[in-house]
Amino acid sequence: MIVNELLKRYAAGDRDFEGLDLQGAYLSKVNLPGANLRRVDLRGANLTGASLQGVNLSYADLSKANLNGANLSGANLEEAKLEATDLRKANLIKTNLKKAKLTGANLKEASLMFANLSQANLDCADFHGATLHQAILHRASLRNTDLIGAILQETDLRGADLSQACLIRADITKAVLMVADLTNAVLLGAELQGADLSGATMPDGKMHD
C-alpha cells in the first residue's frame, strides 16, 4: 500500500491496517496513534519521530527500522521483531514488549519506564543511558547487553539472563534479581543498594545467599 493512501484512510477514520507490507516505507514524523498495525511488515522503514501511542504492533516485523525519537508509549509490541532496530531516545513508557526480539537493537537513552519486557530477547542490545525504572524484565535474555549508566531502579529482573552484560555505573537500586544469572557480568561502579539478589549467580559464578 502506498503511504499516502494509508494516511488518507487514517484521516478518514480507518484504524485497521493489519498485515500490510510497508517494508522500507518512509513514515518519518507520521501520526498514527491507536492504529492496528498487527503483523505489519515494517522492515527497514523510516519511522523517526513518529507518533505511535497505543498502536497495536504485535507480531509486526520492524527489523532494522529507524524509530529514533519515536513515541510508542502504551503501544503493544508483544512478540514483535525489532532486531537491529534503531530505538534511540524512543518513548517506550508502559509499552508491552513481552517476548519481543530486540537482539542487537539500539536503545540508547530510550525511556522504558513501566514497560513489560518479560521473556524478551535483548541479547547484544544497547541500553546505554536508558531508563528502565520499574520495568518488567522477568526471564528476559540480556546476554552481552550494554547497560552502561542505565537506570534499573526497582526493575523486575527475576530469572533474567545477564551473563556477560555490561552494567558499569548502572543504577540497580532496589531491583529484584532473584535467581538471575550475572555470570561474567561487569558491575564496576554499579549501584546495588537494596537490590534483591537472592539465589542469583554472581559474576564470579558463585550463588548469592
Residues covered by each model-derived region:
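Tandem repeat scaffolds
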Residues: 2-209
